[in-house]
Structures are given as C-alpha cells and as structure tokens.
Amino acid sequence: MTTTKRPIALLILDGWGYRENTHMNAIYHANTPVLDRLNAQYAHGLISGSGLDVGLPDGQMGNSEVGHINLGSGRIVYQELTRISKAIADHEFEQNPALCDAVDAAVKAGGAVHIMGLLSPGGVHSHEEHIEAMCRMAVARGATKVYLHAFLDGRDTPPRSAKGSLSHFDDLFTTLGHGRIASIIGRYFAMDRDNRWDRVSQAYDLITQGKAKFQYDNAVTALEAAYERNENDEFVSSSAITDSEGKVASLNDGDALIFMNFRADRARQITRSFINADFDGFERAVTPKVNFVTLTEYAADIKAPIAYPSENLVNTLGEVLQNRGRTQLRISETEKYAHVTFFFNGGKEEPFNGEDRILINSPKVATYDLQPEMSSTELTDKLVAAIESAQYDVIICNYPNGDMVGHTGNFDAAVKACEAVDACIGRVVDALAKVGGECIITADHGNAEQMTDETTGQAHTAHTSELVPFVFVGRDATIDEGGKLSDVAPTILHLMGETIPAEMTGKPLIHVKE
C-alpha cells in the first residue's frame, strides 16, 4: 500500500449549519476557540447540503443519509424521496410490481393490507404523500381492509404537529370508503436504530396484536391524550385505535405489510423483527406469515421484496481509494456509524479493501441532551491514535453531537455539544500537524444553528436548509464559491494528486497555491 505524505482527514460535523440569525443559534453562542482560530488562519467557505444540490426537491432540508451519499459518491445522487414522488406523479407507482403483488395476494386471501411508516411531511425518512398514494392504490386494487399504522415524527417536524396529518388521513379513508388508522406510536419506539429492543417490541406488539398502553376510538383523540400526558409526537405511547365495534386491528397470516419508509437506517430493526425467523431481539408473542414489502432496500441481509431497489453507485471515494491501493479509516459513534460506512460507500455494506472501521458506542441515555458530549472524547482518543499510527491515507470521521443534541430541542445542551466537538477538533488538528496531515472540516446538513421556530416559538428539532462550513486546515489555498457536498470527494482526490473518475461529476473546491 502506498502512503501519502499528507494523510487527509474529513471531519463531518453532523447537524452543523451556518446561520446569519444568531437568535437561539447554538453554534453561534457556543464557545468554539478552535474553529474560530481555524477560520481565521485557513481557507474556508460555505457549501450547500440541501435541496436540488443533493438530489432532493427544491428547498427540501438535507439529512444525514443524503449528505453522506453525496459526500462519498462525488456526484449529485437523486434521492428516494424525489424518485418515488416522481413515480407517483407519473402514475408508475400504482403499477409497481412488488407493491401490486403484495396487495393482490392479500385481497385474494381475504386478508388485510397493513401500511406502516413515519406519517410526516418531513421528507427525511418518509413522506406522507407516498403513504397516501399507497392507501389509494390498495383500495383501487380491491382491498377493503386497509390499516394504517402511523409512526409519529416531531423530530424532522415541529414537536407537536401530527394532528393535521392524522386528520387528513381520517378524511382520506372516509373519501375512499375503506380503511382506517389502526394505531399510532412515536418514532422513538418504532424507529430505534441502537438495539433498544424494549422500544421496538412495543411497536411490534401494537401492529401484530393491537396490544397497546392505551386504546381510543379515534387517532386525533389519541394524540390529544398523549399531549395531555406531556408526550410530544416523537414519544407518543403505543395507542391502538378501535373500529366502530370497539375492535383493534391485528396482523394475520396472508395479510400484506408494507413499510413506507424510504430511508434505511431507522427501518432495519423493526423490519428484522417481522421477517427474520431467527430474530432474538425480543420474544415475539406471534409471528404471522405476511407478504412484507420494503419501499427501498434497507440492508443486503433483509430478504423481502423491494418496491424501489437501490441504484448501483460505482467509483465512490471508497472504491477509488481501494482501486488505487490507498488505505482508509471510517470512524464514528453508533448513531452515525452507518453514515460513514454504508451510506458514504453508496449503499454498500462490505468494507473496501484497505478500509478499516472503528465503532464507538453512543452513550445509553434516553435523549442526548442528558449527555451532550456523547462519546466524543472516546471517539477522539481512537481517532488521534489512528492518525499517529500513520497507517491511513484518508480518514473519514463523523461527530454526531450537533445533530443528535439539536434534535432534542434543548438549546443549552446543544451549546455544550458544540463546545465538546470544538475541543475534540483541536486535538485532531494537533495530531494531524505532527504527521504532516491535512483536514477538511464540513457538515452534512444544518440543525444546531436553529433551536427555535421563529414563527411558533416551539423548539426547532428538525434539520435546516442552511449552508454548511467548509474549512481546509492545510497548505495555503483558495476555495471556490458555490460548492456542494458532491464536490468533497473530488476535492480529496485532487489534494492527493489522484485523477478523478468520470462518474464523479463534482468539482475540486480547494486549489493549493504554489
């Protein structure tokens, strides 16, 4: 393996956007002497991580999955949200073979069509317009028993904003003449990604048996009761919605179960609980044999029909480094480990040759405002050791704090999170200086720079569409304006003196002065 004289580290500060408005801007109010010094001393600018620049609809806020796919692939990758919305607009969705087969089989067997997913206009993990299209398609194909299991958001949307969505779907089912909302539960339970199976089991029992902490005859009533219990959308307890006869919905042999989330990372655990025969995350009271369909590909080992299989991305940064005989390291905490590996590699699970991975466990706390530094110290310990080992040409690291603490809506905690990351960056930059290394500091999307909704006054827990920082800690250089996340991989190759493959349509942003 060849080694560069200057190993390059890419530090991705998750959820770290730039915002002129300083009100409730945790990044602005944090004491960040390291980043202040680097911005004063080195070339820096701002790049785009949202909307059309990352393959999302115009104006759509960025997110971690999308951000890392663009960062790692070096091209604008049209995201599942855009792709599926286009299929609906073009009337291709209603003819999708995987979806049609599942619905038709359930109808033929006299069974029900169960549709589950994040009922939200957030567009990060799902979109309620896709769920509506699925409900319409099921009824159009003859399904009379259509049950919607709604996971509530409050994270990529305002904390208490689900009422409009639930009311809309109540009206939709009335218009269609068939179907109803069968259950509601917060995404905190249904969409865990950190092996907290006690949470997922509550969603599983709710969907399979209608077993819930609470029962109501209407979804909006259930939501209002949750608010009375001081539960925001994300944390709504399992609530079964009964029909006119007081009965709950249950999942039975021969039914269809269609998962309408298009983002993989928070869809995997609950999917495995439904389809893996050897599943051992929790004890399942029932294991109905259903026609399970995933909207997109969640993981290579999840064996279920996929409505929209992944598009194959070749010559991503990781693959190019492998093919050029270079070494690389991917490192992050549990919460963003999939992002610096699976997503950064264009949806490939297996590491490339010469690619090492280090996973640091995220702290076991209910919400990260309780420990805003998360595991950043341990992460940095490992990262500094890796730099000093001089084993790697390229190091990709994600610090999750800005995003994970930003999502809690806790301003003071978000400030502490930013300060913790700043201190860690100082250690990383010092370690790189000792070995003649350089680094690019950027982000995948914004979050912590806006901690309150200026209109409603509610906590702002979602991502933003703000530009993100782009700092080059290295040789004297200039940085082009108007960059985007897909320019980062070509920039790294350019700094290494490597040719940029044709598949990478991004452009190098950093130009070293001779």
Swiss-Prot record:
Write down the EC number: 5.4.2.12
**What domain of life does the UniProt record list for this protein's source?**
Bacteria
Record keywords: Transit peptide included?
no
**Alphabetical list of InterPro entries matching this protein:** Alkaline_phosphatase_core_sf, BPG-indep_PGM_N, Metalloenzyme, PGAM_B_sf, Pgm_bpd_ind
Cofactor binding note:
Binds 2 manganese ions per subunit.
Active site feature: 64
Q: What is the lineage of its organism?
A: Bacteria, Pseudomonadati, Pseudomonadota, Gammaproteobacteria, Alteromonadales
- Among the record's GO biological process terms, what is one? glucose catabolic process
Q: Which Gene3D superfamilies match?
A: Alkaline Phosphatase, subunit A, BPG-independent phosphoglycerate mutase, domain B
Keywords associated with the record:
Glycolysis, Isomerase, Manganese, Metal-binding
Q: What is the name attached to this protein's record?
A: 2,3-bisphosphoglycerate-independent phosphoglycerate mutase
What's this chain's function? Answer: Catalyzes the interconversion of 2-phosphoglycerate and 3-phosphoglycerate.
The cellular component terms of Gene Ontology attached to this UniProt record, alphabetical and capped at eight, are:
cytosol
What is catalyzed by this enzyme?
(2R)-2-phosphoglycerate = (2R)-3-phosphoglycerate
